[in-house]
Structures are given as structure tokens and as C-alpha cells.
């Protein structure tokens, strides 16, 4: 045995993978797919027949779930694609800070203070107006591949 000590620095975070493999031919419209490293919702799928050389191909048109940008990809239908683990969680809105962060109440009674207000103008104004009126608001937070963003709002009545 060696007397040397080895220090290992792990660059990856522990825990579950951000994506899972799925065969391209089985991914359907309104499913999720990773295109160019971004989690996307599939809006259109078309398949081409097998050519003289090669496989049938799937043409995916998808929208980035965080930025709203349209992305496209063509993959042989027998190949595996990365599919993001997408979670949607509802939190009660407690406070909006002046620097654009929100304070949210989790199910177990803790607060979550690391999310910014959404960039979508109509959703942003609905949240600010509802909060200013003193309504009880519940925001829906979508998370995938290490990113989180507020993407919907529910009004559960006055406080």
C-alpha cells in the first residue's frame, strides 16, 4: 500500500441524473427532449421512411421550456435521445424582494428564496398586481436539468 494521500475533487453533483435515455421513435408530441443541451417540449414530430442507406429518421420541433425558443433536431428513430426529468411544484408566494427574488413557502413549512421573478411580462404583472392587492397566490415552478423558473400562477383567494 502507498502512504500517499489522494485528494479527489468531484465536479459533478451527487444524486440522480438530469436526463434519461429514450428511443427517438417513441418520443411523441407534448413529450420532452433535450436539444442542444436545453430541455424542450416537443410540439411536432415527423418521421421519414428508411432510405437506401440507413435508418428511418425523426424530425423534432420543440420549444425550450425556460426560454421559449424554438429548436429542431433530426435523429435516427432507433437511436436514443436524452429526455429531461421535468418536475412541476406549487409553492405559496410569501414575499417579493426589491432585487427581483421571490420568497416561497414549501410544503414542509420551509422557505425557498433562490428564485427570481419570471421574465414573461404578463405573468410578472399578474404576480406583482396580485401580491400588491394582498391575494393569496400560488406559483407553479418548473424544474429541469438544474434550472428552475416560475411558469404559472394560481389565485387561491384573498388573505
From Swiss-Prot:
Keyword Protein biosynthesis part of the UniProt annotation: yes
Keywords annotated in UniProt: Hypusine, Initiation factor, Protein biosynthesis
Record-linked SMART domains: eIF-5a (SM01376)
Alphabetized CDD domains for the sequence: S1_eIF5A (cd04468)
Annotated positions of the Hypusine modification: 52
UniProt superkingdom: Eukaryota
Stretches assigned to coiled coil: none
Region spans: Disordered: 1-21
Molecular function, one GO term: translation elongation factor activity
Comp. bias regions, Basic and acidic residues: 1-12
Protein biosynthesis keyword on record: yes
GO process terms (BP): positive regulation of translational elongation; positive regulation of translational termination; translational elongation
Similarity annotation: Belongs to the eIF-5A family.
Alphabetical list of PANTHER family matching this protein: TRANSLATION INITIATION FACTOR 5A FAMILY MEMBER
Function: Translation factor that promotes translation elongation and termination, particularly upon ribosome stalling at specific amino acid sequence contexts. Binds between the exit (E) and peptidyl (P) site of the ribosome and promotes rescue of stalled ribosome: specifically required for efficient translation of polyproline-containing peptides as well as other motifs that stall the ribosome. Acts as a ribosome quality control (RQC) cofactor by joining the RQC complex to facilitate peptidyl transfer during CAT tailing step.
Name under which the protein is recorded: Eukaryotic translation initiation factor 5A-4
